[in-house]
Amino acid sequence: METQNHLSCTGQTPLTNASGLKLLPQSVEPVYTNSTLTSFSQHGKVLNYDLPVNGLISPSLSNNAHGTLLSNEHITHNSASNNFDYLWKKPKSSVHKDSHVSNQFLVNGSTCPITNGPSIKRSPQETLGNCTSNQTASFNVSSHSVCSPNEANVKMVTAANGAHYGFYEASLPVSVSASNMQSVSGDNLVKERTVEENEAGATEERNHTPELAEALEPSDTQTDLNICEYKESVLDPVIQSTPNPLLPPDVSNLDDPSQLPSQLGDSHLLNEDSLEPFGADLIQDPISSTMYDLEELEVGSTKQKDPQLDTSSLDCPTYSLSAAFPLVAEDTNDSSVLFNASSASPVLGDSVMQESASEMGEDPEGSKAEEPVSGPENVSQDEMTIENTSPEPCVAAEHEEEELEPGEVKGTISRRRIATPEQVCFPLQHGWRREVRIKKGSHRWQGETWYYAPCGKRMKQFPEVIKYLSKNAGPFVRREHFSFSPRMPVGDFYEERNTAEGLQWVLLNSEEIPSRIIAITGKRGRPRNLEKAKAKEQKAKRGRGRPPKVKMIDLLSKADAKLLRKLENQDILSDSEKVQLCKLKKKMRRKARNQEAKLEAAKKLKEIKEKEEKKQKIQKAKNQEKAKNQEKKRTRRQPKQKAPVVQKPDRKLLAQQRRLEERKRQQFILEELKKPTEDMCLPDHQQLPDFPCVPGLFLPSCAFSDCLTTVEFLHSYGKVLGLDEAKDIPSLCTLQEGLFNVGDSLGEVQDLLVKLLQAAMINPGLPPYCQSLKILGEKVSEIVLSRENVSEPLRIFLEAYGGDIELCDSLRSHPFQAHAPHIKTAILAFIVNELNASSLIISEIDKTLENMSHYRKHKWIIEGKIRRLKFALSKRKSSEESQITTTEVSLRRRSERNAEENDELDSIDESAIQKDYVQEEVDIPPSTSVVELERQIEKLTKRQMFFRKKILGSSQRLRTVCLGQDRYRRCYWMLPHLGGIFIEGLPESAEPTEEAALGNDIEASSVKTEDKSFGSLCKTSGHPRNSTAEPEQNSTSCHCSDSKDKEPSGVTDQFPNSVPLTNNQQDLSQSVFLSWLTKNQTSIMDSTVLTPESSPPHSESTPIISSEATEKPEQWLPLISRTPCRNHNQGLSTHSSNRLSPPSPTAATSVKQVNEFTEEAQTFATSLPSNSTPCHVCYNSGKSSTASHEITLTSNILHDSEKEKRRGRRPSKLLKQIEQKYYNQLIERPIPAGVRQKWWWIKDPAMLESLLKALHPRGIREKTLHKHLTKHLQHLKEMCARPASDALFKFTPVDGHRVSQETLDRWSVTDLTFQVDLSALQWVEDLEQRVMLSDLQQRGWSPSAPDSVRTDLKYYEHQLEPADDITVKVKREDCRLYRESSNPLDLAVLRILCLEENVERKYLKEPLWLFSEVQHEKVVITNPEDPLSTTEIEYSITSRLRLWRQTVERCRSAAQLSLCLQQLERSIAWERSLNKVTCLYCRKGDNDELLLLCDSCDRGCHTYCHRPRMNEIPEGDWFCPTCISLQSESEFLRSSGSSKRIRKCTVRFTEDSPSKPSRRREHPTASQFSPGESPASKKRRMGTRSQSPDLTFCEIILMELESHEDAWPFLEPVNPRLVPGYRKIIKNPMDFSTMRHKLLNGNYSRCEEFAEDAELIFSNCQLFNEDESDVGKAGLILKKFYDARWEEFSQERNQISL
């Protein structure tokens, strides 16, 4: 079995041809069945070549004179190396056909069905094809193969156990009916499969001992001989067929003969899932054999013939596959299987063949492992030679067996291929859809794969797909392109999720798919071992019967097993081979014995372990029982103990503990009442003074805030921007009127906007990505801004710096002045903020800071001198009290100085101060008197105040000072330039919680708490504390608990300060506490009970605490002692479930409702430390959850104390009122609406004093405000005393005034836009009149009637499109859009286009008309009525003029139209007007009738001043002497056949006026020409008077270079500040703008000079920049373009010169 040469034997047999029997080996006895020899009749002229096989005489084969077998005529093999080469590489002869017969020879008394020989009808490509190839085999019988008795097919079949089953098959003449000569249909395949399965099941339990057989196949013959042996079979002369149909020979296994597949008896080991991929294709493929048709005819007659016939041998894998035998290539490059099961077996159906070598070696019927008996067989000489000389293919095949391709399974039988993702994606490219549905199962994620056909049909299983493919067979999509594995990442993945609408399938994105696939796969270990897994599957799915034993041959190694099979298969063995065979068998038996011994030892060891475990369990149970018994005895022996006596609680100790808890609760309440808290939580506020609103203010709060920002900025930095403070900076009143579009104030606001925007365009300028934006060919930053056009550059500026998108879109069609006042102020504030980032402002700020440091230095020096003088003065007086006073004064002033400069207070050591004073005293002469010292101190004090004011002024210039906020979150601003204190109300959009957080962040550094708490006071005591009663009082720290400032609180001012707290001696007795309460009862009552005077105005009364506020307090109570107070807001809000009940209408709250608490916090009340409670500053008291938790905490403490039965005096009503006061401060009241969205101001110094008194010292915001007001009180009083210089504060509203609230309410953007558009239309009409009065229009044109006086005009807003932006370049010529005839803006656009077309071209100048850019174009006009009549019109135009027209067509606002109108106005040469023409000689403008105008330059000359004198006006065009001398070309002077004489007069030319040929020329009307065209006689040649044609072409090249997309680095000169080191390397810089300037000024006299400058640009670029940089790449591309254009120019110039 292990050799590959048993089929490729060639050569002559060593015996003579006359010998009837072949000599058998000596060691093998001939075996005969029935002691008979069976001979077969010879056919033709052949010798009797009888072959005894196990006692049988083989049929005679034809041989030639040399004793060799005859070969076919159409196939020859010259050498052993060429055997079966035609099966791989050479096509078979077209003459050859397989011969098929229905006869079978009687071998050993048994019948053998006829099978095909090796199929050679296929080409090598078909033979090597896939097992699923649909190769239709036909039944062809040629006359040659049927009639030739010399041709026979010899076929060898190798069983799975290593023995050879030979079936004799010869090609004999047979008559086959036409009905049988057809391909087998699918129904026949199914029938045959059923028959095979039945027979295989019947023969599965039979045991057979097959014997070895050897097949002979000479190399020079095509005749195949199959020898089949059956032990104890009966010779039956009758020809019959077997019930098992044979398969066509389509599968080859020659690559490794040892791995032949197992027989069909083991096919049931595979489950249906593994067979699924092959079923449909295998059934549908037709079979390339006609034996099935012949077998169908004989099935009925053979079922009852021989019941004892052993057909299990027919179930060998060779016949269960659709191949006769395997073949393998000799070379390693082509090692594919020759016959790869292109047709499926009808017997197998959907089954899949086994593949592993271990499975091949097993006995299919489960027979015992016995040594096979070698039968006497004839072996040719050539076969032995090939076996000895060609061992390499075996090794090659062995390596090929180990290295498999992906998707293949080990073995020679084609297994199901695992589809790759590329294959699975293939159906999706042809209309299929693949969806994987993932949902959560009971234990893990589960996936299900669905396929959707192109028609929409859904398929969930392979049979559905196969059925669909069978009905809709396509040329592309096949079964192997499908996979239902949900772990393959192909198609759409959906996950089942819970949504608001219920369970829905959600499409997963690409990032979620890998995680879902991993979840579907689950936790998997190492990769599966395929061989072990298959072995396990076979054991689990094995059929009935005794399990097969391990074969003895499997005990050997692979090499020994191969050698054993080789030796056993040989008929003749040498002595050495026999010895070797015996050794192998002994080795095999020894290993078998060893293995059995190991199994027995393992079995015995297992039994011993089981016995030991049983003994241990028994012993353990006994020990447990023994222990139980001993325990029972011990309990019986012990005497009964008496029940423990319950001790009565010590009432005194309990009472003392209760009193201690009560004092702790009181101490906690008093400490909390002293801590700063949220201003709106304090119930005892004093009413703030009523501040007057800013008079004359009608702007919204946010708008007025922006106005103040703008005015203060202009006053501080207006001079830096070049603004005049007296003229350019408007007052608040003017600014407000301008925002309301009132009279001249609107112009001032627009002028302010123009100046601010112009400054912002220069510095900081537009961002780099917006610097290339151009309007009408000019950069946006270079446009001359005005009131009319400022809206468009403003829009671009806002878009560049990320302004509001809606505002930018609004500015596209609406001007600045049409927007609401608050929008306009927001625009001004936006520009001011951007100007703050300019380098000018930053440098000014740096200078201010430097000056402040200089002033501060001088102030410190002066303060040092004052300190030394005061110290000397105090020492001179020799007064100890004065010295102490001086020390205190110096300390206070030093602290004030540090506070002014925003420095922290530092602790001062008294001894260091004394030493410092002693050192400073040395500088003062001892003879100085006291009066002199006081005078010096007074002088230095004045200088100190001077520097302090300088520092204050500088700091106010840097920033506006915010003094703080009051209880209503109103900001107090100190504005130095306006005077007074401005108060800004809370904006409507601001959230209280956000403001509270902001206030906490701002005031965290300055907010401090009240006096030290009782817990801190107790620290001064020397007595140790009981750690059990008061554990870790300082476990929680707070940044608000270390204040040194004393507050005038009525509750805490007179409280004792140092009383120790111990277990024996209490810190404060009940009587002392009650006596203190009695003394202060009046003050506490006044500050506790809520009255209309003490409660905040417009605030709601105290709400009643809900009874649900104390549920489950243990969830949050431990957090207080463990978590820092700054995190309490987060920690407590997560557990908050408390809510406040609706507010009570009464002023005071019922004590009973407050004291309804639960008992959960009783233990906490006993151990609650006084310092562990967080302060309310850290709580972010704007959130109700924190307040409710605090209420729960304190209410639980009160309830616990009141729950117990008290002894002695009951708590007084005053204490309950204090507790109620504490509860009230935990509730934050809303800010009244009356103090929002408003502005107030303080102008009276007395109002500051009342404000200071009304501020609450415990409010976190008002405390900071009080501090800052006190600090700057003197300066603030001075500011309030200043007279109000702004007219806004003196404004008195009058009915009907435009500055009113009604104007804001009635504000309409469209109405104001309509007025601006109407003014633009009037501007266009005025320009038309100017052109007519200057006589600059074409002859015969006059403007139409004014449209601005029409009454049917109305506003129309166009739809905005991105392509209509005037900054976007367009290439289309026709940009005309729909224009509304009643819209003023559209009418203005039409009129300005008409005006430009009718302005005489010679009166146009830059920027629209450059003579070097003039292009002559022609237009053909077709008459709609007469299509055959066309008119060709020539006109001139420039690129800038074309751009101007396109821009006008895209105008959507008056600002855009103003830009176009201004450029047109600049492009008209107003100085050439006939009203200003004078004579060249006499310099007078009189005698208009005799004044001639030059047709070239429009200069005039009197006829009598001309030399020679002209008596008559000449015919044709007339040119002045200057133009004649400058013009060298005669073509320019050709007469057009008409005279042109224009006199200086304002009278319009009419058709009916008397015409003189010598005076005037008839001009065609404007209607004769297309828009923008002038008469043909007015066309000028390209080129200017001062430039040659060559320089004109240079200008064209320069224009093309400037418009090139890579010309951006060379358009402007390089800025040395931005590019350091440029001037050091580049000595002669050059750029395109410099070249254009030189070209326009006439600095170029020759083209070579122009070329030198151009080359200089490129050489500088190459010298300074690297080739890989962006600038270097741009320079290389631009140089190539320039060289190409210059070459064209040179060629054209050379042609002209020739």
UniProtKB/Swiss-Prot annotation:
All copies of domain DDT, residue ranges: 701-766
GO biological process, one term: rDNA heterochromatin formation
Keywords: Bromodomain, Chromatin regulator, Coiled coil, DNA-binding, Metal-binding, Nucleus, Repeat, Repressor, RNA-binding, Transcription, Transcription regulation, Zinc, Zinc-finger
Chief place of localization: nucleus
Presence of keyword Lyase: no
Recorded superkingdom: Eukaryota
DNA-binding region per Swiss-Prot/TrEMBL record: 541-553, 541-553, 1204-1216
PANTHER family per the UniProt record, alphabetical: BROMODOMAIN ADJACENT TO ZINC FINGER DOMAIN PROTEIN 2A, TRANSCRIPTION INTERMEDIARY FACTOR
Record field: compositional bias (Polar residues): 377-387, 1023-1040, 1051-1063, 1124-1149
Database matches in PROSITE patterns: BROMODOMAIN_1, BROMODOMAIN_2, DDT, MBD, ZF_PHD_2
Domain notes: The MBD (methyl-CpG-binding) domain, also named TAM domain, specifically recognizes and binds a conserved stem-loop structure the association within pRNA.
InterPro entries: BAZ2A/B_Bromo, Bromodomain, Bromodomain-like_sf, Bromodomain_CS, DDT_dom, DNA-bd_dom_sf, Methyl_CpG_DNA-bd, PHD_BAZ2A
UniProt source species: Xenopus laevis (African clawed frog)
Biased amino acid composition, Low complexity: 1091-1108
Function field: Essential component of the NoRC (nucleolar remodeling complex) complex, a complex that mediates silencing of a fraction of rDNA by recruiting histone-modifying enzymes and DNA methyltransferases, leading to heterochromatin formation and transcriptional silencing. In the complex, it plays a central role by being recruited to rDNA and by targeting chromatin modifying enzymes such as HDAC1, leading to repress RNA polymerase I transcription.
Domain Bromo: 1585-1689
Record field: transmembrane: none
Subunit field text: Component of the NoRC complex, at least composed of SMARCA5/SNF2H and BAZ2A/TIP5.
Ranges for domain MBD: 418-489
Pfam families: Bromodomain, DDT, MBD, PHD, WSD
Protein's UniProt name: Bromodomain adjacent to zinc finger domain protein 2A
